[in-house]
Amino acid sequence: MKGMKEYIKKLEEGSDLSSEEAEAAIGEILSTAEDEEIGAFLLALRAKGEKPQEIAGFVRGMKQAGNTIKPVTPFRVIDTCGTGGDGLNTINVSTAAAIVTAAAGVPVAKHGNRAATSMSGSSDVLEALGIKVDLTPGQVRKTIEKIGIGFMFAPVFHPAMKRVAGVRKKLGVRTVFNILGPLTNPAGAKGQVVGVFDKKLCEPIAYALAELGTEHALVVHGDGMDEISNTGETFVAELKDGEVSTYTITPEAMGMLRAKPEDIKGGTPKENARDLLCIFKGQKGPKRDLVILNAAAALYVSGIVGSIRQAIPIAEDAIDSGKVMVKFNQFRNFTAELSIQGKKEGSCPGEAFLASSDTSVLSPASGEKA
């Protein structure tokens, strides 16, 4: 069996690792490898460039080393997650889009972490909104099944990642770990919208997702953002039915006005939380349009509509009808109850809240409760 030294040598020679070798390497990195070996491996891989089978192997290895859940849901579970690192400091688009998507009836297993390069990460803004993010895996599964949305806080689900934190900080450059987060969804989401900080990553990540068994995914880079953009063109690598295709979309093609970058700027977690609440309550403008575009993409990969454009009215209605605020309040209240009382083994302390609330999932495709 090969070890880290062999993997490092192979990478330094410019050769690609097989998916199995990549999986074994990440297993060593997250367990027994020395810091010097980890640093050399990451730098050699960065110099060579990551290939789809390597990315897929790393993802498998990370999932093996972490915690996973299998929520039972009426529809395909989806995730909206970006790599971050675009340096544009927008509002928390994928987090807002996740709540809108859940309000439209699609179960969401949102994966995220604290801010690394921006002022506000997904967990930061959720905490500012009063949502508990440090739930156990079992509690998150209950939240997805009962409410239709759950947040999987990366340190809870990938505790072994703390082994590489020091090395990554010391290296001071982007490594493969900067792109693995959105791909290691602990709930095994089969539909994904993945935002990336570099257009060149779109196709390799789409092919990696294909190898990992993802059913439908959009890997996007929009006008410098790790989101679908309403300020310019968005490059998309779409994985569907095992095939990857690429194309570009514009705000105008989606029936939306083109915005200016300053119109969608974010701020601190509290400032972004305020912006998200305004959007949820129906305030119109470029920030709402940006959230709707990305929620529509999530609805598309869920399989309930045939295109992003077809999903836009569904996302708009979820906000304007008040469903989004209802879903947000359910999410906040249920996670609060679980956080306070959920340590009792085998109990589901949110049942009292559920009994007094209409939390049934409404299918936008049929209008029937499921």
UniProtKB/Swiss-Prot annotation:
Note accompanying the cofactor annotation: Binds 2 magnesium ions per monomer.
Gene Ontology molecular function terms on file: anthranilate phosphoribosyltransferase activity; magnesium ion binding
Residues where Mg(2+) 1 binds: 94, 227
Protein name: Anthranilate phosphoribosyltransferase
Organism in which the protein naturally occurs: Methanosarcina acetivorans (strain ATCC 35395 / DSM 2834 / JCM 12185 / C2A)
UniProtKB keywords: Amino-acid biosynthesis, Aromatic amino acid biosynthesis, Glycosyltransferase, Magnesium, Metal-binding, Transferase, Tryptophan biosynthesis
Subunit-level organization: Homodimer.
Listed cofactors: Mg(2+)
EC number per UniProt: 2.4.2.18
